[in-house]
């Protein structure tokens, strides 16, 4: 079954040629994640033309500036975004210096609070440490693609929004997020077509993008004993609330 754009949402998609084309033609409520000043500018142009596109940006633990750089270009670009992120801590998928990660994470959390921006979090392998840091920086948080078997309830106790990606049926950690997150804090994300391909091991086409959002919703619906349309409506409403929490 197909669904109208007005029911669809994607809490986290990276800027790409496909994302730019799709969002120029569709009213899917979306947060476009950017990691460079150039991406921020492009995403801002998309957002200017589509009231359902919002921009996130920040210094990702995978892409820390050189120690003597200061990250000034990206810091200036962050002033253009609606939501800060994705930012966080990662000792699994990258070898960035952990002390530098901690510094940038804490500094950006403070900036988000001072500027009134909600935050998208990338946490991998450092869930417990990140949790302790977040407890000292109260804000509105979206934990993107949480894949740790532990600490989920602790993040939920902080009031975090949690997103379900591709797919609960193939990842027990994603299924746990779908099952245990309160309905009013549940979001849907793809992380982009390339991430869907990586997660599924399939050559997913760009034409499959809307169906991917619906499939995630359908799997949540089965877990929560709801209809797919109910889940699509709820997660879109939740994303709108998260975006406008600043």
Task: Give the location of each predicted region.
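Mid-domain alpha/beta scaffold segments of enzyme catalytic cores
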Residues: 1-246
């Amino acid at each position: 079954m197909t669904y109208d754009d007005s029911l669809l949402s994607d809490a986290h998609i990276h800027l790409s040629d496909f994302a730019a084309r799709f969002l120029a033609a569709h009213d899917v409520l979306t947060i476009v994640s950017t990691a460079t000043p150039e991406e921020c500018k492009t995403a801002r142009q998309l957002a200017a033309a589509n009231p359902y596109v919002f921009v996130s940006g920040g210094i990702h633990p995978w892409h820390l500036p050189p120690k003597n750089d200061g990250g000034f270009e990206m810091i200036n670009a962050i002033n253009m975004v609606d939501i800060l992120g994705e930012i966080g801590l990662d000792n699994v998928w990258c070898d960035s210096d952990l002390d530098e990660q901690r510094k940038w994470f804490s500094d950006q959390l403070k900036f988000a609070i001072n500027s009134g921006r909600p935050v998208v979090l990338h946490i991998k392998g450092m869930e417990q440490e990140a949790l302790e840091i977040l407890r000292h920086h109260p804000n509105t948080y979206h934990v993107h693609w949480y894949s740790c078997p532990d600490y989920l309830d602790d993040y939920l106790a902080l009031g975090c929004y949690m997103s379900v990606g591709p797919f609960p049926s193939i990842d027990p950690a994603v299924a746990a997020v779908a099952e245990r997150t309160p309905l009013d804090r549940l979001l849907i994300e793809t992380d982009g077509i390339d991430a869907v391909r990586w997660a599924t091991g399939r050559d997913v086409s760009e034409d499959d993008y809307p169906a991917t959002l619906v499939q995630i919703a359908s799997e949540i619906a089965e877990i929560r004993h709801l209809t797919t349309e109910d889940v699509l409506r709820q997660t879109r409403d939740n994303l709108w609330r998260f975006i406008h929490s600043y």
